[in-house]
A protein has these predicted regions:
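Catalytic cores and adjacent flexible loops of soluble metabolic enzymes
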Residues: 1-161
Length: 161
């Protein structure tokens, strides 16, 4: 079995489509099989943060996701996301992503939309990569994704990384 090399772009594109496209191309040139972004809403996770304007600018909207997915396809590199709210699943499904990533904070089920987001992803039947770095109830997570192919990742969730 060949390892999947995923380049984590996350929010490092700072809301700039041109910067994101450059990163996608560089990831492809470096030999990555896939690029992964994060699809969250600033209001859900960062309301009141002192760097609100910068954070809000880095939000991956549906329109931006569509542009980046199209560009990744043109570069022949897979595009997928960590998803933090259920409507993002609908967006990514309309774009035809092949898999989903679940952040360890989502596995804690502490955020407003965590459970609903997990259930929305599970309903797609697509493979999921699940981080358990912050913990969470692995048995419950496995039950939610009983019909999906699951890959668990274990890491130290210490930021900045």
């Amino acid at each position: 079995m060949r390892a999947l090399i995923v380049a984590e772009i996350a929010s490092n594109w700072e809301g700039s489509i041109s910067k994101a496209k450059k990163l996608i191309k560089e990831c492809k040139n470096a030999g990555a099989d896939a690029v992964k972004f994060q699809m969250w809403r600033a209001l859900d996770l960062y309301e009141g943060h002192p760097d609100w304007k910068i954070i809000k600018k880095s939000e991956l909207t549906f329109k931006k996701a569509e542009k980046l997915k199209k560009y990744a396809d043109e570069q022949n590199i897979e595009f997928f996301c960590s998803v933090f709210y259920p409507e993002a699943v609908d967006c990514l499904e309309s774009l035809g992503v092949k898999k989903y990533k679940i952040a360890s904070r989502t596995c804690l089920l502490n955020d407003n939309y965590s459970l609903e987001t997990l259930e929305s992803i599970a309903k797609t039947g697509k493979p999921v990569i699940i981080s358990m770095g912050m913990g969470g109830n692995k048995k419950r997570i496995m039950k939610i994704f009983s019909k999906n192919k699951i890959t668990f990742c274990y890491c130290i969730s210490e930021y900045p990384a």
